[in-house]
Amino acid sequence: MAEYKAPLRDMRFVLNEVFNVAEQWAQLPGLAEVVDADTAMAVLEEAGKVTAKSIAPLSRAADEEGCHWENGAVSTPAGFIEAYKTYAEGGWVGVGGDPLFGGMGMPKVISAQVEEMVNASSLSFGLYPMLTAGACLSINAHASEALKEKYLPNMYAGVWAGSMCLTEPHAGTDLGIIRTKAEPQADGSYKVSGTKIFITGGEHDLTENIIHLVLAKLPDAPAGPKGISLFLVPKFLVNEDGSLGARNPATCGSIEHKMGIQASATCVMNFDEAVGYIVGEPNKGLAAMFTMMNYERLGVGIQGLASAERSYQNAVEYARDRLQSRAPTGPQAKDKAADPIIVHPDVRRMLLTMKALIEGGRAFSSYVAMQLDSAKFSEDTAVRKRSEELVALLTPVAKAFLTDLGLECAVHGQQVFGGHGYIREWGQEQLVRDVRITQIYEGTNGIQALDLMGRKVVASGGAYYRLFSDEIRQFIASAGSELDEFAKPLGACLDQLDGLTEWVLEQAKGNPNEIGAASVEYLHAFGYVAYAYMWALMARAAKAGEGDEAFYTGKLGTARFYFARLLPRVNSLVASVKAGSESLYLLDAEQF
């Protein structure tokens, strides 16, 4: 693998020149006192150093070694304990955490960049702090003050970790049929019993305690999803003075043997009357858990982005160094036996596809993160409502589109290496294996597409969609003639997406299958148009940029490539959606 270098220049461009995030922070009382442009850039610079120096060098060896289970205990690969200690002591686990309990208090748009850096360094490693931060979000939003005071400081400090225990052997997407039970006790606690599977970070040796958030049902709970409650179940009970007490019967029965993320412990967790404490109200557990889902799903999208970035950095270095054949137009490196493969059109196509999708994804994920910040911190109810609705609309796109493209980019990066990309020592095949899970967990991408199409577009009668569409139209209307090469094709594709949205809304009235039939390709069409909007914004900023000519001309060249070679994918997606659901049901089940 090439030495990982955090893409700080591009992050600064997106945050400062494209979105001017400091202006947003100044208008949000919860952030104005905490962060400004200089502070944010200092945070990102330091995060870049920590991830590149302490985490990235572990990735290849950790993939080979993996995690090991023995008698209920899980050991992580060599170097992980020390790297996690360094990461935690720097405050990075709590980078977006509540300052009242020891968090750094950075806005989501900054913690999103940190997430990209840590996941590009090692996706397996990044899962441990990600799950802890997610658990903290739910605890902070829904738990009692006593639970918050008892657990959050050590979790933000990285001394304790967190996990989310949702899935059961028979219950994945349909959590309403879970069987884990919680029995009330006289002292106000609960005894939690059941088995959970696919639990990331359910057991490991990185922290002295692990705080599990467990979905379970009370004895008198209503059937289905409306009968689910959320419980905090610590690995070790915590005494009144904050010291660790007895071991709770929340144990790891085994770890999964899987395709990728070998250094992340994916556990089967057994709860045998484990002591737990309710988080939020009885039978409102899904609402409490879903507080963090928008953050977590954006985080998974960023994992796809991060894997693509790491693969791209490796592929660019290899393409510059690898000598094979001569350029079609004649020798470029006349003093060498062959030209670097970066001169060949197809290699350039793959590299530019990666670059355009990565940089578009970085801008889009930052945009969504800014909406999360507005929804959380704005005191203007209208602003907060608009941001909440945009978050609802865009989160499934961020999760699914970034991870689908993350796999595409990782495969391109592997392909640039040719046969060497298939060999483990180069690291490219690891990135393909690792990023694959991002399309599956935190809600499969098919489920994300159904969420976008059914719950967000159709259920709102297109109102959520029009919020975003209208914003893009306002940008197009205000763009000067110098942006015509981007604004005009953006407008044309937006017209297509508007028409497609209306078509699906109409078709769904008569045939519910049309939603499912359209959903994945609709999400992709939406994603390409959203990226076109991001690229038009970036082109405007690049045209206004001063100094650093190579960066800005490179940005404009990549924008032109996106509009010329990638945005036209919308055409085939629209045609496919409008073919309807009929052909999906021409075969009986036995004919497959």
What are the language-model segments listed below?
Residues 1-126, 150, 373, 582-592:
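Amphipathic, small/basic residue-rich leader segments at the start of a protein or domain
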Residues 2-5, 184, 261, 367, ...:
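Alpha-helix capping/hinge segments and adjacent helical runs
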Residues 32, 64-76, 288-299, 313-354, ...:
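Glycine-rich cofactor-pocket loops
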Residues 80, 128-132, 143-185, 369-388, ...:
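Internal maturation/activation junctions in enzymes
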Residues 113, 459, 475-592:
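C-terminal amphipathic alpha-helical interaction region
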Residues 133-135, 144-147, 442-444, 452-496:
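A structural-propensity feature for long, helix-poor, extended segments
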Residues 189, 193-247:
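A short core secondary-structure module
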Residues 198-200, 237-253, 258, 265-296, ...:
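A glycine-rich, basic-preceded beta-loop-alpha segment at the flavin cofactor/substrate interface
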